[in-house]
A protein has these predicted regions:
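A secondary-structure boundary/capping signal
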Residues: 8, 106-107, 183
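Catalytic-core segments of class I nucleotidyltransferases/pyrophosphorylases
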Residues: 103, 117-120, 124, 154-196
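Conserved hydrophobic/aromatic positions in well-ordered beta-strands
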Residues: 25, 149-152, 180
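N-terminal glycine-rich phosphate-binding loop and ensuing alpha1 helix
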Residues: 1-62, 75, 82, 116-120
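Short glycine/proline-enriched turns and hinge-like loops at secondary-structure junctions
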Residues: 17-19, 144-146, 173-174
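Alpha-helical scaffold segments in soluble metabolic enzymes
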Residues: 36, 40, 93, 185-189
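Conserved beta-loop-beta/alpha segment of the NTase-like Rossmann-fold superfamily
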Residues: 62-63, 67-155
Length: 196
């Protein structure tokens, strides 16, 4: 089964005021932020995983940086449609490249899995059961939730409500999403939920 991974990377990064795209901010000598997304799939190749990177016209350094993966993965670059806003607009701009099984990872969000877990397997198995699935991190700090895609997850582990960067009701939420997966046929249901 092939997994298509979308990396929304079209933001201007104005808050950090870096002279280069924030996605290539160094974490250590070997890795930048965006490498975290590729490292989840180090045991896979182009037959199992392909990438879509949504960019703007100022991301040429990012394209050059990701060339190091060209021998291992198919990577498509697409410009964010200027009529589409925020991260959901970046994701919608990649729709024409989606596969049947898709995963959205935010390149500037560091995510770690439980020991022994494999992201490819988690996502492909989840999408066999449901057409839309979040990978979440429990969070009680309301100041953190105000900066994230906040979720209310019930006791059964189901996402009941979502709000992007809540200002008034942050205390209601108990988690935020780190990634989400969807089947192509469920995309508009998924994105409408996230844009409401």
């Amino acid at each position: 089964m092939k997994l298509t991974v979308t990396l929304p990377s079209a933001g201007k990064g104005t808050r950090l005021n870096l002279p280069y795209p924030k996605e290539i901010l160094r974490l250590d000598n070997d890795n930048a932020l965006i490498d975290n997304c590729f490292n989840f799939f180090k045991d896979y190749g182009r037959n199992q995983v392909e990438f879509i990177v949504v960019i703007n016209e100022d991301k040429t350094d990012l394209i050059k940086y990701l060339a190091k993966y060209k021998d291992r993965y198919n990577i498509s670059f697409v410009f964010q449609n200027p009529n589409e806003k925020e991260y959901t607009g970046a994701i919608k701009s990649a729709y024409h490249l989606f596969g049947e099984h898709n995963l959205v990872l935010l390149p500037d969000t560091l995510m770690r899995l439980q020991p022994g877990k494999d992201l490819y397997t988690l996502v492909t198995e989840a999408l066999e059961e449901t057409g839309f699935s979040f990978l979440v991190k429990k969070e009680e700090n309301k100041e953190v939730l105000k900066t994230k895609g906040a979720l209310y997850v019930n006791n059964e582990g189901n996402v009941v409500e979502y709000e992007d960067k809540p200002t008034d009701r942050a205390e209601y939420y108990n988690a935020f999403w780190c990634a989400f997966a969807f089947r192509r046929r469920n995309f508009y249901e998924c994105i409408n939920f996230m844009e409401k």
